[in-house]
């Protein structure tokens, strides 16, 4: 029984599905997708649970969410193993994901009060009050790269605001989704407040097409995000928050500490086997001897990175991609760029055929035309050389995406220029592109989102504002508007 609907674990009636470890092919999870009728049932359960959940005092909702945080801490080791085995990422990285999930609770509570709490301004004859109300029933679509942390970033603030939810994990990480929901169950969520439907494209389409949804919160690829945007077009009454990918540039302008710059680049491009939406995809390196030396050192160190199993000891820097098919897609993208005229600096290599273990690849594309403006979700770094900083910014902005951008430089003035001219929601200076803070908004422009940033700003799309002018008693104004006469006339 792999679906959780209205507080009950039930068996899906859709397509049979199984999840294997992307390196060892060990079977980890088996179950059936939710069919359209079960998706509708989950929505009905969420709708029925909404009025009571929304009327709960915030402190009551907060108590359940904080109990979930306690359970995450108590089961951190177990959840770390589940995430590592299912995604293929090393244990150390899976552990940091669970830690981020735990930390998200307190941050979301603070964000609720800061962004969407109640504010009152005293007036001469009463008060002006700002309150926030939950939307109602929201669908949450989770990704596979952070199957615990990223859905958590939607679910926690949405529940705190008083919404009820239907959660569909990625079909590539059903085990993590189920494991997390079981902790929510133990936290004491009332029946129907949070529902789990497993499945792939058909389940997702059934969920996103429900008329009774009040909104949809999505993290995933740009192609799916655009599809959802088209599907919900003409429905302005529904909130749609899209957190999509990027074709992110990292500018290497001035290197005073060669190894520090190489380390920052490795963290930006290859952490999580290149499967972070903020990963550097395009490396822009200044022409000249210093840039040549930097690239040589980068290729040297990156060439020593050996991806390993999730349970290898010593632990590797990177693990496997989410699937062997994902690794094959990266290889095909590299070959395509070679065919366009790219010069391979470091060839990606499958560690073992049929698995998702893939070494990093670096290819120079200076002067190459018709390079696809796409997010290749894996350890493939494209290099361009530039002559001057204005050209670097032009190259950085030469994308339909706009998620993250970074600069390695000793010149603060160059960073200030980048802040003014970059088209990206995250712009870092001498910090990895993959470094983000939950105390700041997270999102991008262009094809990277629809101006609904998450993290600290997630509270904004989980509630709508209600403004009130209030007075405990009704009185006639001392000064009336022109033309109004309230004088009492003698009866004739």
UniProtKB/Swiss-Prot annotation:
Q: What chemistry does it catalyse, as a reaction equation?
A: N-succinyl-L-glutamate 5-semialdehyde + NAD(+) + H2O = N-succinyl-L-glutamate + NADH + 2 H(+)
Kindly tell me the pathway this chain contributes to.
Answer: Amino-acid degradation; L-arginine degradation via AST pathway; L-glutamate and succinate from L-arginine: step 4/5
Where along the chain is the active site annotated? 243, 277
GO terms in the biological process aspect are:
arginine catabolic process to glutamate; arginine catabolic process to succinate
In alphabetical order, the GO MF annotations are: succinylglutamate-semialdehyde dehydrogenase activity
Binding-site list for NAD(+): 220-225
Which SUPFAM superfamilies does this entry report, sorted A to Z?
ALDH-like
Keyword Oxidoreductase tagged: yes
Q: Which InterPro entries match?
A: Ald_DH/histidinol_DH (IPR016161), Ald_DH_C (IPR016163), Ald_DH_CS_CYS (IPR016160), Ald_DH_CS_GLU (IPR029510), Ald_DH_N (IPR016162), Aldehyde_DH_dom (IPR015590), SuccinylGlu_semiald_DH_AstD (IPR017649)
Q: Name one Pfam family in it.
A: Aldedh
Classification via Gene3D superfamilies: Aldehyde Dehydrogenase, Chain A, domain 1, Aldehyde Dehydrogenase, Chain A, domain 2
Keywords tagged on the record: Arginine metabolism, NAD, Oxidoreductase
Its function, per the record, reads: Catalyzes the NAD-dependent reduction of succinylglutamate semialdehyde into succinylglutamate.
Can you name this protein? N-succinylglutamate 5-semialdehyde dehydrogenase
Instruction: Report which gene this protein is encoded by.
Output: astD
């Amino acid at each position: 029984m792999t679906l959780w609907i209205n507080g009950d674990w039930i068996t899906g009636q859709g397509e049979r599905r199984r999840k294997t470890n992307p390196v060892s092919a060990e079977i980890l999870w088996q179950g059936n997708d939710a069919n359209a009728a079960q998706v509708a049932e989950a929505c009905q359960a969420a709708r029925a649970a909404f009025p009571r959940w929304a009327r709960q005092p915030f402190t009551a909702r907060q108590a359940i969410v904080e109990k979930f945080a306690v359970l995450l801490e108590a089961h951190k080791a177990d959840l770390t193993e589940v995430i590592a085995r299912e995604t293929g990422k090393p244990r150390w990285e899976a552990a940091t994901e669970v830690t981020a999930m735990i930390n998200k609770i307190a941050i979301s509570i603070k964000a609720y009060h800061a962004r969407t709490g109640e504010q009152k301004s005293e007036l001469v004859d009463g008060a002006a009050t700002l309150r926030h109300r939950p939307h109602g029933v929201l669908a949450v679509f989770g990704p596979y790269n952070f199957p615990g942390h990223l859905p958590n970033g939607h679910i926690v603030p949405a529940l705190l605001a008083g919404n009820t939810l239907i959660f569909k994990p990625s079909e590539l990480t059903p085990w993590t989704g189920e494991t997390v929901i079981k902790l929510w169950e133990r936290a004491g969520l009332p029946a129907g407040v949070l529902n789990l439907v497993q499945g792939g494209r058909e389940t997702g389409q059934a969920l996103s097409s429900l008329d009774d949804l009040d909104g949809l919160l999505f993290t995933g690829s740009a192609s799916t995000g655009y599809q959802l945007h088209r599907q919900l077009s003409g429905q302005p009454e529904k909130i749609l928050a899209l957190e999509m990918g990027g074709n992110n540039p990292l500018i290497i302008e001035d290197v005073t500490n060669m190894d520090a710059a190489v380390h920052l680049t490795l963290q930006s491009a290859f952490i999580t086997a290149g499967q972070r939406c903020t990963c550097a995809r395009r490396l822009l390196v200044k022409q000249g001897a210093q840039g040549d030396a930097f690239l040589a050192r980068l290729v040297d160190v990156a060439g020593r990175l050996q991806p390993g199993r999730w349970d290898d000891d010593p632990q590797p820097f990177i693990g496997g991609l989410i699937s062997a098919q994902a690794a094959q897609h990266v290889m095909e993208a590299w070959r395509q760029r070679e065919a366009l005229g790219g010069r391979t600096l470091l060839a990606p290599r499958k560690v073992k055929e049929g698995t998702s273990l893939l070494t990093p690849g670096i290819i120079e594309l200076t002067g190459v035309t018709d390079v696809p403006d796409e997010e290749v979700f894996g350890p493939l770094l494209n290099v361009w050389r530039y002559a001057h900083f204005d050209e670097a910014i032009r190259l950085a902005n030469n994308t339909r995406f706009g998620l993250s951008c970074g600069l390695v430089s000793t010149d603060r003035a160059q960073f200030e220029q980048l802040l003014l001219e970059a088209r990206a929601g995250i712009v870092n200076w001498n910090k990895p592109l993959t470094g983000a803070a939950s105390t700041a908004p997270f999102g991008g422009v262009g094809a990277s989102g629809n101006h609904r940033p998450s993290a600290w700003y997630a509270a904004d799309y989980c509630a709508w504002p209600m403004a009130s002018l209030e007075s405990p008693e009704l009185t006639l104004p001392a000064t009336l508007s022109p033309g109004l006469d309230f004088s009492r006339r003698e009866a004739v």
